Amino acid sequence: MPNLVTVVGENTHILPHMLKHYEDVIDKAYVAVYRQSDDDGILEEIEELGIEPFMVFTEPKYNWERVTEIYNTIKQTKPNDWWIVSDDDELQVYPEPIEDIIENCERNGYEFVTGGFLDRIGIDGTFPKVTRETDLHRTFPLAGFFRHPMSGACPNKVTLMKGYQKVTSGQHYASFNDGTNSWGTEHKRRMPIEECFTQVHHFKWDSTCVERIKKVADNKKDYSFSDEYKIMYDAIKKNNFKIDTNNLKFLVEDMKELSYIEYKDYPHWD
């Protein structure tokens, strides 16, 4: 089975649900804790959750490039293992068992698997409150693809890879030693998307997301992608702090299965 690596920062309440989602398909979870200052209380929150961090690092707020460096560093501790790289608000879903996908990759010389975001939101485009007891599937019954058309954010993700395979900032592409990356629809080391394209169900959109998006926008740093966050914040504000579920570009649909995530449930995944 693969390992899992994730980085958790100021938003910890999705983390228990995320770890629960992966627990039966991974060998071990490696949790890195991102402290934003020396008096950041996140370590106490992680302790309350019963999680032992693999690594703790302190960095200025919203440095997504540093987060990616941490992912690459931790994966290198077991370079020949397979790893799932998942942010703490992402629940990845594969079209077949992960062990079968890894076997296919080993047999054909593929070194990484890719996918894309599905944005999960509440009824009528709202941003629900999440606690440890929340049933994510029923609380976020809508899935769509709105962040890219809304603000131009890259929707691609590298989800499963060998430990030595580095990823670019945001985990959007595989990064190679010659300075190139896996941008494009095909790469000889990439499992073809016709065989596997991972759904990354993004539960970013909870009751705290507007405040968090505003903070990143106000950070005004290139490494935070603050310009994109400002566009996103303004678009959400314009729609009364909800997602416009009637916007056809956002491809918002009701998920039929509300006890788990069914890969074939979302009708526009093609």
Q: Which role fits each region the language model picked out?
A:
Residues D38-S86, V93-Y94:
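Active-site-proximal specificity loops/subdomain of glycosyltransferases
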